[in-house]
Amino acid sequence: HIFMMRDEEMTYNPENETVGENILMKRIPIKNGQEHIEAVEEAVQKIARALRRTRSKIARRVYRDAFPDGHQEIMLVYPFSSWSEFEGGVRGLPEGFQDRYEKIYGKGSFRKEVMDVLSAHSDGVTHEIMTMVK
């Protein structure tokens, strides 16, 4: 069983919206070791800062293990309304987000500070879709 708690510092929820009918969950199992946890947390935090600075309309909630047993995991939860939102780009994040991130942090920073960090410090990222059935 996994018990996750919302991390308000890394969460971006501009209009305090509630979980919608469709959500994308990105699960990031972090490699063991404090340096891995810190690196992934910093990458996730920088994305939150960029979402705030660009006043994104898309919410992103961040959850972490409430009772880590030596293995930490972070879950990113994004609402979506249409399957077309998954065409191209970085799933979950707003269209054009990578370019806006690099305007804030510098050219090539998204790959270096997000993609390369997740590759080096996590055991990959899985994507799960949950949709409400009426």
Residue ranges, per PLM feature:
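Short S/T/G/P-rich N-terminal loop/turn motif that feeds into the first structured element of a domain
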Residues: 1-134
